[in-house]
Amino acid sequence: MSLNPHQIFNESGIQERGENARLSSFVGAIAVGDLVKSTLGPKGMDKILQSNSSGDIVVTNDGATILKSIALDNAAAKVLVNISKVQDDEVGDGTTSVCVFAAELLRQAEIMVNAKIHPQVIIDGYRIATKTAIDALRASSIDNSSDPAKFRSDLENIARTTLSSKILSQNKNHFAQLAVDAVLRLKGSTNLDNIQIIKILGGKLDDSFLDEGFILNKTIGVNCPKVMENANILIANTAMDTDKVKVFGARVRVDTTGKLAELERAEREKMKAKVEKIKSHNINCFINRQLIYNWPEQLFADAGIMSIEHADFDGIERLSLVTGGEIASTFDHPELVKLGHCKKIEEIIIGEDKMIKFSGVEAGEACTIVLRGATHQLLDESERAIHDALAVLSQTVAESRVTLGGGCAEMLMAKAVEEAATHEPGKKAVAVSAFAKALSQLPTILADNAGFDSSELVAQLKAAHYDGNDTMGLDMDEGEIADMRAKGILEALKLKQAVVSSGSEGAQLLLRVDTILKAAPRPRERM
């Protein structure tokens, strides 16, 4: 048997092994953390994302939005992007924190690997530290769910903390009230589909408001009733046009204009029969996802039925949810179709736009937040900010314990982990201690982003915690340490837990890597 090395990969395939693979993972993940860390905290900066293809721009400081908008080639960087996406889906906020924390853990791991500490020892240390940190966090949490007034105050404080790092920070009191009112209407549900967010250009951010009802950004058909009481609503996704010849590009050859008129008459009769089938459902409102042409619209108006056309798919899905109806495509069996219901439908005007308001819907918790603003970019970023606040609040209603913000929770966990490190033997203690250093980096980054002396502030914060003042954190408005409980700077326990556990698991996953295999690109076949 020949001992010469054999090439087992395609010539274009790439293999990185050992230290090279580990270094590639560390560099990619740390680069992602460094990319987003300047957006962290109440004084974090925004990023402009510009598309090469369309030229569209997005102005945001939302970690998940930034990371999913950029093309990455590094495998480890993609892992961090996925962690950020899961954080966004699960909790709604903390997407930047989880990336930065995972990157800091890997930065510490790189130092330890260079000091000849085996990755498995580091992983074991990180596991011990994660459990210690979460136990300390849970022990320090507060639960005011038994007192409605205190719990509402906690929710408003959490909303203000979440919005402090967003574009709505200057209007955080106003939007915190809107978000809390909207979430409390859900009565404990975490389904945010019952909260519709509409963006209307014009006015200022303070003009935004919460409306108790569902608002659809469409107009009512011509000559149809503009107000409907006790509405029975048929929601459909069906073609309501007679011009099939144009739609499908077919050609019909006729030798007289009479035959053309006969063809048109047949099409109209067919549409009239379809409208009669729809009317047989005993409805007074018809909402279609597709266009409703003039002829069927006139037939509905003559029958006193309100018709609404071209409702976007997202809007019609939410509408079916809140009115209790189902989206129908065929109308042969009225007894099988589930209609939606609401007490009142009316046309309203917001700014210069006409819209349709559904009041007294089946899902009594449904409501609409109407956002006003000067530019599309401002409205889009405001929507992302209010969505983050709504997501965190809905999770807090389900898991009501809260913890302190402003770097307080991180320093409290770091202290507990440092103390645990003194009880661990050998090199494992170094890994546990490194976890505490990574936790301490989060308040350091908060202070750096605010332009303060982070070394001095974090040293003061650490000293305060070791003196037993475990409610102290960073006040980024004054540039000093302060009592976070007295300041009302709170965060959801579930959010903090998710940041620590997801960041730690992501770092451990990448620490296990010793080989990266890149497949060769598929050759393009000529036609």
UniProtKB/Swiss-Prot annotation:
Q: Name one Pfam family in it.
A: Cpn60_TCP1
Please provide the record's keywords in A-Z order: ATP-binding, Chaperone, Cytoplasm, Nucleotide-binding
| Compartmental location | Cytoplasm
What is the protein name for this chain? Probable T-complex protein 1 subunit beta
- Gene3D superfamilies, A to Z: GroEL (3.50.7.10), GroEL-like equatorial domain (1.10.560.10), TCP-1-like chaperonin intermediate domain (3.30.260.10)
Question: Taxonomic lineage per UniProt?
Answer: Eukaryota, Fungi, Dikarya, Ascomycota, Taphrinomycotina
GO MF = ATP binding; ATP hydrolysis activity; ATP-dependent protein folding chaperone; unfolded protein binding
* Cellular component GO terms held in the UniProt record: chaperonin-containing T-complex; cytoskeleton; cytosol; nucleus
Give the UniProt family note: Belongs to the TCP-1 chaperonin family.
* Gene Ontology terms describing biological process: protein folding
**What does it do?**
Molecular chaperone; assists the folding of proteins upon ATP hydrolysis. Known to play a role, in vitro, in the folding of actin and tubulin.
- PROSITE patterns in the record: TCP1_1, TCP1_2, TCP1_3
Q: Which organism is it from?
A: Schizosaccharomyces pombe (strain 972 / ATCC 24843) (Fission yeast)
Quaternary structure note: Heterooligomeric complex of about 850 to 900 kDa that forms two stacked rings, 12 to 16 nm in diameter.
Please indicate which superkingdom the organism of origin belongs to.
Answer: Eukaryota
Enumerate the InterPro entries for this protein: Chap_CCT_beta (IPR012716), Chaperone_TCP-1 (IPR017998), Chaperonin_TCP-1_CS (IPR002194), Cpn60/GroEL/TCP-1 (IPR002423), GroEL-like_apical_dom_sf (IPR027409), GROEL-like_equatorial_sf (IPR027413), TCP-1-like_intermed_sf (IPR027410), TCP-1_chaperonin (IPR053374)
